[in-house]
Amino acid sequence: MTSSVSNTQLNLRIISIVVFTCICYLSIGLPLAVLPGYIHYQLGYSTLIAGVVISLQYISTLFSRPHAGRYTDIWGPKKVVSLGIVCCLLSGLFTLGAVALQSVPLLAISALLIGRIFLGVGESFTATGATLWGIKTVGAIQGSAWKTEIIPR
């Protein structure tokens, strides 16, 4: 088998991992364009509250990242990525719920807060799991090649 064929096969193996990572980061980036304005103008909360709601995702990412690594070691990266995508989906459902509850701003902001927590956990699980899934997929094949480039014999 030639080197170019094996590189093509490795690239094809990694595509699904890249797709899951893309879905995760789209679910993170797209709401950033509209959520602060929605919280401030539609729900009537201050810009400080809007900032707290946005920041809650990153705080939950910070606290859930070690758990994501531990669960990846226990369950394997595919299951952790799947769980992360489910958390991102739940975040979207809570965000849609906030729109449905717009007439009751306290319930709407509560739904957004819960959704942002799910999104932070989803980011941790998807990013950690996808990174380790990629290493597991190509690491055994490419690991020795990388080692010889980094550590000369």
Listing of model-derived features with the role each one plays in the protein:
Residues Q9-G37, Y41:
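Pair of pore-lining "gating" transmembrane helices in MFS-fold secondary transporters
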Residues Y38, Q42-L43, I74, W133-V138:
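Helix-to-coil boundary motifs at intracellular loop junctions of multi-pass secondary transporters
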Residues T47-G51:
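Small-residue hotspots at the loop-to-helix junctions and early N-terminal turns
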Residues Y58-P66:
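Residue-level signature of mid-helix packing/kink "hotspots" within the transmembrane helices
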Residues V86-P105:
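C-terminal ends and interior cores of transmembrane alpha-helices
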Residues G115-R153:
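Cytoplasmic helix-loop-helix junction between adjacent transmembrane helices
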